[in-house]
Amino acid sequence: MTNLKKWKTLKSKMVLDNYWCQVRQDEVELPNGKIIDDYFVSIKPDVAMVLPITSSKKIIFVRQYRHAVGEFFLELPAGNFDPTKESAEVAAIRELTEETGYIPQEFRKIGTLYDKPSKDTNQIHLFLAENVSKVGEQQLDITEEIEVVFIPVESVLEKIVQGEITVAGTVAALLLALKFIS
């Protein structure tokens, strides 16, 4: 049993609320009595992320530009979803199909992680999609330009170590999936 105590929220107000971003400013009291009046929380939708593997044991990644840091990244297919409109499972398959044109023959949830719980509210729901097959072309959003990349399962760990795969959620999903990959 821990003696740690939660913070108390004294006041909360939305300081930014638009389609792309919601930010809440909280006034909180710490267990030691200190007051922080400008603790900012990013309210983000949950993410469905899928690790797709072909029958030839290649993992399908997407390479895309991320404007916040001005770089291209290798990531697993993923996207935001609204749990009042679709399940994490449905969202994961939708994102896989939209971003890569592939669908899975076998599909299962392998975990749920918090993205960045010090500032963000969202969770990442992780799925393993095995024996995926191509069923069509990508159906990308207007903000997306995505290259589909195939990497053999046995090469992935080295690519993480070499710094070629650096997005935290993708790295966590890959490491977690090692237990489940047959």
Please provide the spans of the model-predicted regions.
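Conserved Nudix-box catalytic region and its N-terminal flanking loop in Nudix hydrolases
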Residues: 2-6, 39, 48-94, 140-142
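Nudix hydrolase/Nudix homology domain
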Residues: 2-7, 72, 141-182
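A short coil-to-beta-strand element that immediately follows conserved catalytic motifs
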Residues: 8, 103-110
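Short, solvent-exposed loop/turn elements at beta->coil junctions and helix N-caps
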Residues: 12-14, 111-116
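Acidic, metal-coordinating catalytic segment for phosphate/diphosphate chemistry
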Residues: 13-49, 54-55
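Active-site-adjacent beta-strand/loop module that shapes the phosphate/pyrophosphate-binding cleft
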Residues: 25-32, 116-135
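Short aromatic/basic micro-patch
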Residues: 75, 126, 150
